[in-house]
Amino acid sequence: MCNYSGSDVVFMAKRIGVFGGSFNPLHIGHLIVAEAAWQEFNLEQVVFVPTGDTPHKNMHHISKIDRFEMVKMAIKENPHFSISSIEIERKGLSYTVDTIKQLHAEWGSEYNIYFIAGTDAVADMPTWKYNEELLDSCHFICASRPSSEERIKQAVAYFGKKGCEKIHFLRTPELEILSLIHIS
């Protein structure tokens, strides 16, 4: 699809948000982030992807099937939210880069993927498997809090120009409050 603006031709791919996370448990902050990302980045939809067996977290006190069902129930009334079982069905460790590759293969080149993640995840990106390849294959929307800006700046700087172009920020003031009252 082309968007003609004067003599410039701009190819407009559809934007789809992929919200990966343990959702252990899912809380209102996750839903606020998904809704804000959908609105601010003009996403066609937001696909929630509960993590399977991850290399970075070993704290799934709620089973992956129960987390999947919890997210599914929470988003069922929102027409621009959906859920994918791609990671919970994967055997062995689940890496974000593999998920994004598989989604690109399923959806085709007409979609630009915007991976929605929290501050901690984006700050840890320099340690992720195939992080450069991952950043080549999708954009990141970082749901950040003002208190975490320095860690995020360091992660963006690690990736240089590509980090500046592909890591975007989503500020939702409610998250600062929610992080203070969240009970683990």
What are these regions (language model features)?
Residues 23-24, 53-55, 120-122, 146-148, ...:
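Short, solvent-exposed loop/turn segments at secondary-structure junctions
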Residues 8-10:
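Acidic, Ala/Val/Gly-enriched low-complexity intrinsically disordered segments
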Residues 181-183:
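Conserved small/polar residues in nucleotide/adenosyl-binding loops
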Residues 136-154, 163-176:
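Short, flexible loop segments at boundaries between secondary-structure elements
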Residues 52-139:
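N-terminal Rossmann-like or analogous alpha/beta NTP/dinucleotide-binding catalytic cores
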Residues 13-42, 46-52, 118:
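N-terminal catalytic cores of NTP/NDP-binding nucleotidyl/phosphoryl-transfer enzymes
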